[in-house]
Amino acid sequence: MDKGYAYEAGGNIYFDTSKLKEYYVFHNFNEEDLEVGVREGVEEDTNKRNKADFVLWFTKSKFDDQELKWDSPWGVGYPGWHIECSCISMKHLGERLDIHCGGIDNAFPHHTNEIAQSEAYLGHKWCNYWFHILHLNTNS
């Protein structure tokens, strides 16, 4: 938050994607292309400043039964999906990665958000190469 990349709204801490020059690193689209609620059960988050903003820390969530919670400066809560992976990577692999890989379904928003928050925090390029693997579908 001190660097201006995050904001508090509705009890949660959000990453402000408008603060980045290059947010959509894996896709040739922009915020207007994003559709809210495309997936079943996903509701629009009216606390977000921009459609692509994402939660770094939850203190208010529709998941009341979330068991793992910790104290924070913003209240008891838990990390957002993307921050978990960035923290684990940095703790065990350091602040510069050569290669990061995952399924093609993680390119956006997951890996895009990992890059955004990691590079905002570190102040430098985080990962040199990204590999996104396609899925193999079979009949059985």
Feature map (PLM): residue ranges:
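Alpha-helical recognition segments enriched in aromatics with Gly/Pro capping
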Residues: 1-140
